[in-house]
Amino acid sequence: MATAAVERCKRKLPDRLAIVRADRSQRQFARDLGVFQQNVNRYESGTTPHTDFLITLALKEQISIDWLLLGKGRMRRSR
C-alpha cells in the first residue's frame, strides 16, 4: 500500500474510534475495554493505537478490523 494511502487510513482512524464509542464518554468506553481513559483520548486525538488496544477493541466490541483500520466493509463483525 502506498504511503499516502496509509496516511489517509491513519487520519480517519480517530473518527472511526469515536463512531465505535458512540454516546459513551471516553471514561466509560475505556472502562468497557479495560484500558486507561488517557489512551482513548490520545487515540481519538490522532496518536496511533497499540496493537493490543486494536485487538481488544475488535474483540470486545465485535468490530471488523478491516472497517476499523481501512474503512472497508461493515463496522460490526458477523457473529
Give the residues covered by each predicted segment.
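A short, Lys/Arg-rich alpha-helix, primarily the initiator
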Residues: M1-R24, D32
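DNA major-groove recognition helix of helix-turn-helix/homeodomain DNA-binding modules
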Residues: D52-W67
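DNA major-groove recognition helix of helix-turn-helix
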Residues: E44, E61, K72
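Short amphipathic recognition helices of helix-turn-helix/homeodomain-type DNA-binding modules
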Residues: W67-R79
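Alpha-helical DNA-recognition elements
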Residues: D23, G46, R74
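Short alpha-helical DNA-recognition segment
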Residues: A22-R42
